[in-house]
Regions:
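Conserved beta-strand in the GNAT
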Residues: 19, 26-37, 50, 55, ...
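Conserved GNAT acetyl-CoA-binding A-motif
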Residues: 70, 75-89, 227-238
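Conserved acetyl-CoA-binding loop-helix of GNAT-fold acetyltransferases
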Residues: 51-56, 61-78, 211-223
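Flexible glycine-/small-residue-enriched beta->alpha junction loops
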Residues: 102-119
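Conserved active-site alpha-helix within GNAT-family acetyltransferase domains
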Residues: 78-83, 89-107, 239-252
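Intrinsically disordered, low-complexity, positively biased terminal segments
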Residues: 120-252
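Active-site rim helix/loop that mediates acceptor-substrate recognition in acyltransferases
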Residues: 1-41, 150-175
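A short, polar/charged loop-to-alpha-helix boundary motif
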Residues: 38-45, 111, 196-203
Length: 252
């Protein structure tokens, strides 16, 4: 049954929490959350139901509770105009039973900082220190980035707490935004310095850029860490044409 069986509030206003109950004892067996998002797809924005909170009490696993939640929720998703649903599966085979399929792949780029030879940048870099000073620039970059890739979630203002609460000195996470000489935002990166088996590295949790100039600006920033760091690592969508962004691939 829905979280409130007497009020099927449209998903656009509230998350929807579904639960399955044991018919004899009335005990809650399983839960599924469906949260409202907007995603980019082929130039348009569409409603997407994000699946989360999938859980069953151990004694009720494999008892059909999750299946029952999906059987009730999916028709309402259709009725409310949802085009997509998205989740991180604990089992690909299990969720294929409900029509889910793998749709997102990405690269993990690992670049040797000593090999970076970016052109000198005529722009500037700004370090986030909390507050919303960089919020307009980073939101602009996110909107451009999201428009390039299918299934990218359109970020709301509430999604930027990581930026508003930036504290590089205490958290040791560094968020830099790159700007052109004219003051246009080119890219940004959020990273930590981590000791790993292959060296002391810059490990990015977020990296966005606009065009070749944006990528070059971030590489210019990273190259300044080459004296005491070995690699920079960052995730990218698999369709990003890395071979055109890096001028030299040979390390011979």
């Amino acid at each position: 049954s829905p979280f409130d069986p007497n009020d099927l509030t449209p998903f656009a206003e509230n998350p929807c929490i579904w639960a399955a109950f044991d018919e004899e004892s009335g005990e809650m067996m399983s839960t599924v959350y469906v949260t409202d998002y907007r995603v980019q797809f082929d130039g348009g924005r569409y409603k997407m139901g994000g699946i989360g909170g999938v859980a069953s009490l151990p004694q009720y696993r494999r008892a059909g509770g999750i299946r029952a939640c999906f059987q009730k929720a999916v028709p309402i998703l259709y009725r409310e105009g949802y085009v997509f649903s998205y989740l991180y599966p604990f089992s690909t085979a299990y969720y294929r039973k409900f029509g889910y399929e793998s749709c997102v792949q990405r690269y993990l780029a690992v670049l040797d900082l000593r090999q970076l030879r970016p052109a000198e940048s005529s722009g500037s870099f700004r370090l986030a220190r909390g507050g919303d000073m960089l919020l307009p620039a980073i939101r602009q970059l996110d909107e451009r980035w999201e428009a390039q890739y299918n299934m990218m979630v359109q970020h709301a203002e509430a999604d930027y707490r990581w930026l508003l609460s930036a504290a590089p000195a205490s958290k040791q996470e560094f968020i830099y935004a790159a700007f052109s000489a004219a003051g246009e935002p080119l890219g940004y990166a959020a990273f930590k310095k981590q000791d790993e088996p292959d060296g002391r590295n810059l490990v990015c949790s977020r990296l966005r850029f606009f065009g070749k100039d944006g990528f070059a600006a971030l590489m210019h920033l990273f190259s300044r860490f080459a004296s005491d760091h070995r690699f920079v690592k960052f995730p990218l969508p698999c369709c990003t044409a890395m071979q055109y962004l890096l001028p030299e691939w040979s390390l011979g």
